[in-house]
């Protein structure tokens, strides 16, 4: 059971996990772990399933998925019958009213929908993956010089599950560098997997870029793929000025993660998010929601 903190009710909700039995089998059973290492974590598995989700055959999965996870389609720009395949539905866009944004210069917004963890005063060699597991930022981006700039800063981990809106956005106005790609495996980013695979973020396929924001300084953006996420699509134009809330890119089918690193003393994350992280809980947030300030 995965409990997520609800900021509105100030209580904990139980996360509905797509494919829970499969995840438990793959990461907690001896046979499942063997199958995971031999096949599931490999590119071929995600590519095969991705091809299916890109085909018209996958269209029949859409309504059942919406019904099972109670997805509010009134927020979407398309009707159910307008989607060409499951990936088209998965990467759906929302109406502008669905995710209101506070454009105040001192307000930090969430880059996407998901479950947020916040870690302050980070040690580059011991960045927290999940309680009890750490990794090296230098290894994550394979660039020690850039990594060193974020010593003592803040790390935000936004975990997306398959039921979420899967587009990610810029948290401020500014310009972003070209995204650098790092090949890797396709482990799940579900907490069950994070508790069973050390340095998972450093092992998975990922991309990173530097966002020079107007109000929060230099921000390191990292997008991490996961099982069945064969593609991370960047839709922004490198070095072209963007506005706060504009789309940066999106993930195709599967759970996935966006990680942001801020330099020391550039932001202050909302206290409820920080406190829940210390207690070992993620906080549910939506794109555009206020999560901190200067």
Swiss-Prot record:
<feature type="active site" description="Charge relay system; for autoendoproteolytic cleavage activity">
    <location>
        <position position="256"/>
    </location>
</feature>
<comment type="subunit">
    <text>Heterodimer of a large membrane-associated beta subunit and a small pyruvoyl-containing alpha subunit.</text>
</comment>
<keyword id="KW-0444">Lipid biosynthesis</keyword>
<keyword id="KW-1003">Cell membrane</keyword>
<dbReference type="GO" id="GO:0005886">
    <property type="term" value="C:plasma membrane"/>
</dbReference>
<keyword id="KW-0456">Lyase</keyword>
<dbReference type="InterPro" id="IPR033179">
    <property type="entry name" value="PSD_type2_pro"/>
</dbReference>
<keyword id="KW-0210">Decarboxylase</keyword>
<dbReference type="InterPro" id="IPR003817">
    <property type="entry name" value="PS_Dcarbxylase"/>
</dbReference>
<dbReference type="InterPro" id="IPR033177">
    <property type="entry name" value="PSD-B"/>
</dbReference>
<feature type="active site" description="Charge relay system; for autoendoproteolytic cleavage activity">
    <location>
        <position position="113"/>
    </location>
</feature>
<feature type="active site" description="Charge relay system; for autoendoproteolytic cleavage activity">
    <location>
        <position position="169"/>
    </location>
</feature>
<keyword id="KW-0865">Zymogen</keyword>
<keyword id="KW-0594">Phospholipid biosynthesis</keyword>
<protein>
    <recommendedName>
        <fullName>Phosphatidylserine decarboxylase proenzyme</fullName>
        <ecNumber>4.1.1.65</ecNumber>
    </recommendedName>
</protein>
<dbReference type="GO" id="GO:0004609">
    <property type="term" value="F:phosphatidylserine decarboxylase activity"/>
</dbReference>
<feature type="active site" description="Schiff-base intermediate with substrate; via pyruvic acid; for decarboxylase activity">
    <location>
        <position position="256"/>
    </location>
</feature>
<comment type="function">
    <text>Catalyzes the formation of phosphatidylethanolamine (PtdEtn) from phosphatidylserine (PtdSer).</text>
</comment>
<keyword id="KW-0670">Pyruvate</keyword>
<dbReference type="GO" id="GO:0006646">
    <property type="term" value="P:phosphatidylethanolamine biosynthetic process"/>
</dbReference>
<feature type="modified residue" description="Pyruvic acid (Ser); by autocatalysis">
    <location>
        <position position="256"/>
    </location>
</feature>
<dbReference type="Pfam" id="PF02666">
    <property type="entry name" value="PS_Dcarbxylase"/>
</dbReference>
<keyword id="KW-0472">Membrane</keyword>
<comment type="pathway">
    <text>Phospholipid metabolism; phosphatidylethanolamine biosynthesis; phosphatidylethanolamine from CDP-diacylglycerol: step 2/2.</text>
</comment>
<comment type="similarity">
    <text>Belongs to the phosphatidylserine decarboxylase family. PSD-B subfamily. Prokaryotic type II sub-subfamily.</text>
</comment>
<feature type="site" description="Cleavage (non-hydrolytic); by autocatalysis">
    <location>
        <begin position="255"/>
        <end position="256"/>
    </location>
</feature>
<keyword id="KW-0443">Lipid metabolism</keyword>
<keyword id="KW-1208">Phospholipid metabolism</keyword>
């Amino acid at each position: 059971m995965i409990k997520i903190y609800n900021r509105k009710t100030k209580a904990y909700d139980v996360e509905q996990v797509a494919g829970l039995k499969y995840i438990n089998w793959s990461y907690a059973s001896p046979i499942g772990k063997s199958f995971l290492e031999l096949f599931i974590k490999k590119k071929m598995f995600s590519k095969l399933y991705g091809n299916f989700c890109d085909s018209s055959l996958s269209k029949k999965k859409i309504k059942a998925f919406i019904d099972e996870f109670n997805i509010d389609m009134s927020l979407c720009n398309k009707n159910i019958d307008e989607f060409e395949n499951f990936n088209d539905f998965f990467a759906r866009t929302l109406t502008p009213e669905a995710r209101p944004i506070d454009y105040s210069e001192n307000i930090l917004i969430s880059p996407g929908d998901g479950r947020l963890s916040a870690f302050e005063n980070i040690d580059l060699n011991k960045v927290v993956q999940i309680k009890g597991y750490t990794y090296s930022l230098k290894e994550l981006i394979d660039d020690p010089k850039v990594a060193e700039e974020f010593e003592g800063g803040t790390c935000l981990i936004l975990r997306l599950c398959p039921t979420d809106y899967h587009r990610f956005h810029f948290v401020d106005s500014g310009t972003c560098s070209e995204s650098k790609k790092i090949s890797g495996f396709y482990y799940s980013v579900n907490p069950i997997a994070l508790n069973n695979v050390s340095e998972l973020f450093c092992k998975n396929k990922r991309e990173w870029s530097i966002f020079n924001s107007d109000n929060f300084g230099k921000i390191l953006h990292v997008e991490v793929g996961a099982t069945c996420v064969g593609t991370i699509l960047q839709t922004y134009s490198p070095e072209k000025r963007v506005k706060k809330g504009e789309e940066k890119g999106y993930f195709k089918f599967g759970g996935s993660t966006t990680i942001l690193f801020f330099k020391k003393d550039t932001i202050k994350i909302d206290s409820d998010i920080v406190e829940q992280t210390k207690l070992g809980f993620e906080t549910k947030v939506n794109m555009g929601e206020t999560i901190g300030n200067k």
